[in-house]
Amino acid sequence: MRLPIRAVTPETESAEIVGWVHEVRDLGGLSFFLIRDRTGIIQVTIPKKKVPAEILDTARSVSRESVVRVRGTVKAIEKAPGGREIVPEELEIISTAESPLPLDVAEKVSAEMDTRLDSRFLDARKPRVRAIFFIRSAVTCAATAFLASRGCINIATPKIVAAATEGGTELFPIAYFEKEAFMNQSPQLYKQMMMAAGFEAVFEIGPIFRAEEHNTVRHLNEATSLDVEVSFADHNDVMELLEDLIVHVYDHVAKDCSEHLAELEIDLKVPSKPFPRIPYAEAIEIANKTIEEKLAFGDDLSPAAERAIGDTVGQHYFIVDWPTDIRPYYAMPYPDRPEFCKAFDLMHPRMELSSGAQRIHDHDLLVERISAKGLSPESFEFYLKPFRYGMPPHAGWGLGIERLVMTMLDLPNIREAVLFPRDRHRLMP
Amino acid sequence: MRLPIRAVTPETESAEIVGWVHEVRDLGGLSFFLIRDRTGIIQVTIPKKKVPAEILDTARSVSRESVVRVRGTVKAIEKAPGGREIVPEELEIISTAESPLPLDVAEKVSAEMDTRLDSRFLDARKPRVRAIFFIRSAVTCAATAFLASRGCINIATPKIVAAATEGGTELFPIAYFEKEAFMNQSPQLYKQMMMAAGFEAVFEIGPIFRAEEHNTVRHLNEATSLDVEVSFADHNDVMELLEDLIVHVYDHVAKDCSEHLAELEIDLKVPSKPFPRIPYAEAIEIANKTIEEKLAFGDDLSPAAERAIGDTVGQHYFIVDWPTDIRPYYAMPYPDRPEFCKAFDLMHPRMELSSGAQRIHDHDLLVERISAKGLSPESFEFYLKPFRYGMPPHAGWGLGIERLVMTMLDLPNIREAVLFPRDRHRLMP
């Protein structure tokens, strides 16, 4: 029975392990291998004069990153990783790696992002890269459990759609048999329809597709969105839910992923609730104190502005009370000052993580807002119909999983947080 | 504070509820409403002479399926649903439904599937329909927790891809900027690449897209697939994992979703392990005993054959030891009898739920099998490359979530198990 490498301790007597050859060293009478599996690294030491000839032959022929099986005696040895090594009684090459490798897994030579992504299967063998994706897995699993515990129903909405969420821009067209269709930008309209269906609280973790021309370190053309929508709730209610989720997920990662965090040399601080709520008008004032290109009321926040505010606030925060004109048509205006709306962004000091709002649930107001945005209510009929048959008040948000992971782990490029990024130029592997 | 309707008991003194007007009845001096939220139904009784005039006015104007808020005194009353009713002190219409409704939510008139799907937001208000999707949510959440507890890493693989998984058929083309791309049929190649990346055990729950022309009660063009892949495992190991998952999920639903199961009048039997393993050759013999169109060795199983075998076996079972020729190129042939391979299907008595196999991990054998299928190894280079740099032995499967829910809940049409189906003719809503 194979043991995970982490389970082999200095006290273990004998062990069988499988893994990849991380390093090979030859010191005259001794050969050393480092063998790596997803749980850790162990040294295999071959005293050339003491092992059977066939083990020596195999050891001589094995290349780095080949997959091997080793069975042998475990010895405590202070200098080795984890304070133990294996002296093999059996050594089998399960799968041979060609040389040279297209990428250095032992990270002695650092590679450009494009080179890394071209050989992502090798890149992701690096313990630091693996740590990111194991943490990402912990994030999505913890978010699923948390939202289910809060009574949210896990839904799956279609990714092939006939209409755009927010007008016709930034859509990838699909040939759907004899019809034209699009890859969905957002589950927005569908999760709202599930409020009309009386589901009351839903969530989805799934892909979204945006044909943005931007090719930056924080944009992807295919990303993973965590979407939530709750009935009989306003923007304040769902901001609290979002805040609770963020804190829960950070806390879970801090407790459950300590080895991966150590691998990344990250001392994860769990943010504390409540996050500050900063009105939009105040946010641009804060930004204008330091940024070069001053913002006027009604401007969207530039990346420079986001950084300036983030530097001032120094933690997660919400920007609230946005001008209605710069938010999507479905954001609910304040009844007493309709030039502002019940929309919010959740910000990490580095960038925006999530957008949300209380939504308009009144059919006629929604039609008015769609028209005011220069869109045609006719093309939204499938979405508008539910608003005529008992749509409850509701609110929700969408949270970018890659941005959440990127900011949590202080990654410089969003591509670090997705296994196989899709961007303006990359469609492979 | 609003109470969920289920939480209002005959012992409750007073309560505020929100919900949809399920039914309205007028009996001279008394008006009755049934109000429905996602947790249940409650009767609201209005003694016309005893309530304030404004409540009476509101009650007279309210239409079925409008959203209302009711605050009042709770009285135990045997004949009412749940043995209690509310006599309102406040009654507010939150959102008015137009009349007539495009679909009858109280299910007095049953509707055609197409009519139902055209107004899915109303259809899903029916307690029976809601029950299906709340159970589906329990299934995906329980599967996520189960697989995480078994050490599987939750991954997200791209849905926009440059190449087909199994040749060029049944793909939806996308215009990806200036390039042609496709919507992915299956995470197969990507989850295998994550085995090369040393992740050792992964899972994904996500959409798959198949441009099949079939328009049957068990095909969808967009479906949800639960995909698993495990390294250093063979077909038997992953069949056990799949079996454990099925039993776990059934058990979870049986325990956690008793009200939804009652709504569907389903007495859920948790299948018992191990499921029978029936070799393909034996399976066609069983089928040929009863079916009209006899199968020859090397034929795929027809729906009639699946039913015939299912009737004989009477429970979940595996079909194993398939002819290599009728399985995908990546299925591992038995070394001692390469005309058979280590592939399997998990069957419910009604239909196939899952396909899996130990995969080929040897590069040259894989190239040979791709060519033997009439495909070009050159177009699979991005997939083949990892096999040259230390690909471990691995096995896995893909499980259709809709089919799992459909068979669990004895639904006649797979469209019952997906909120917004996409089929040969349907792209809306």
Curated annotation (Swiss-Prot), chains A, B:
Query: What's a single GO CC term here?
Result: cytosol
Protein name listed in UniProt: Aspartate--tRNA(Asp/Asn) ligase
Q: Which UniProt keywords apply?
A: Aminoacyl-tRNA synthetase, ATP-binding, Cytoplasm, Ligase, Magnesium, Metal-binding, Nucleotide-binding, Protein biosynthesis
- Tell me which residues bind Mg(2+) 3: 352
InterPro entries reported for this sequence: Aa-tRNA-synt_II, aa-tRNA-synth_II, aa-tRNA-synth_II/BPL/LPL, Asp-tRNA_synthase_2, Asp/Asn-tRNA-synth_IIb, NA-bd_OB-fold, NA-bd_OB_tRNA
**Catalytic reaction(s) noted:** tRNA(Asx) + L-aspartate + ATP = L-aspartyl-tRNA(Asx) + AMP + diphosphate
Subcellular location per UniProt equals: Cytoplasm
UniProt xrefs under Pfam families: tRNA-synt_2, tRNA_anti-codon
Give the source's domain of life in one word: Archaea
Q: Supply the NCBIfam families for this chain.
A: aspS_nondisc, PRK05159.1
